[in-house]
């Protein structure tokens, strides 16, 4: 799964600048980003909680030998997801133009309309993924994710190039159709895996007597599905709803600061590109630690509180081992990264926003730990407070001419710091889980500084030498790659020598062949 996640995120990272370019720059990307924010909000309402509920219920029921009811729970949740997907798809399609007006980007209506069927497809897709993950079969999810992203990118590029002569509205629609086709391809794959898996299970358990296995009523199954799914859905809905509100506010407040509509759309698109770039490392950071969370939940349920604290701190340790150097590197090397990816302006914005990787990674992990110790309602409340404060600050700060788009940077940091502090207080006071954040970030920060000391001379020397005969793109790209390689080696060696990482940490983060070459 982790290798598939990395592959998907790399493809996604490369797709953003390419799409930005073929849509005509940040102003065109702003239209796509607005449509995509609407889709992201509706998508999490249908797929954030119910697949988790399916996975959890299927795991619990199969562990007690109740495979028949595990399948029944899956079918029940799948029906709910399909019904919800149909309703939300129809709402998106019917109200595409009013929603686009609310988003303050009327050209995005066609993108919203063409994304509507994707909600239903993804609802069904997530149901099958949840079931197969609950049966401990991760291969279908991994394979389908990679295929989905490749098909999405390929179809989107072809359609955008074919339709952009008809204007930005149609070009964005082409990109949105690519999303639907990618999801449909993934759905075909998981259904095929599901069918084969069911056939194998029938052969494996033929003639098995299930009469002695305790059974749950349909009402009880439904209650469990809702109990497991609703808190996660609400939490994700608040977060993505906040992003949608930000998107609707931003362009209007930039115009209130005295900027033209085109300049406002350009800056809005610039922020969209920056956030999409930051989403990639943030997702990698959180996915690295997420496997520890069921262990934390199990330890807490068994009242092993000391071990719960230990595992929670270890999850944060892994988070900071990756998040700290990524934040530092994106801050310092934002300019050459933008050149390498073929993006226009916006490197300064990425540099200022880079440490949101660290903060958002922390908040996501805190929310997951709080879910594990039965404090998800509190985590949701604190996230909601952060979203509300962010919307208010965006409204005020973005309209200040001297700040404009950088007002959104300030509000972003504040919106993460608020739930971070409140989550920490809640975990310590109510559950006795103290995360030693300062201590856990100290060594990665020191080693991150050493990483810069090792990588910056490599970058500057390469930039100087190549600059004499090569163009800007080649010079910056090669210099950045060499600096990154030097920085990675220096960072991990420094972490080993300072005791920041041991062999078990390296085995979780680096492939075996790379560990062998670096002697880590």
Feature locations, PLM:
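Membrane-proximal transmembrane or re-entrant/amphipathic helices at the cytosolic face
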Residues: 459-520
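Short membrane-interface helical motifs at transmembrane helix boundaries
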Residues: 87-107, 325-343
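Helix-loop junctions and terminal segments of transmembrane helices
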Residues: 48-63, 274, 282-303, 316
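Signature of the first transmembrane helix
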Residues: 1-52, 89, 93, 118-119, ...
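Membrane-interface junctions at transmembrane-helix termini in multi-pass inner-membrane proteins
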Residues: 123-144, 355-385, 396
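C-terminal transmembrane helix end/exit motif
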Residues: 159-163, 181-214, 415-464, 489-505
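Interfacial/gating helices of multi-pass transporter permease domains
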Residues: 19-41, 168, 172-173, 220-228, ...
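Alpha-helical transmembrane segments of multi-pass membrane proteins
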Residues: 105-127, 341-366, 381
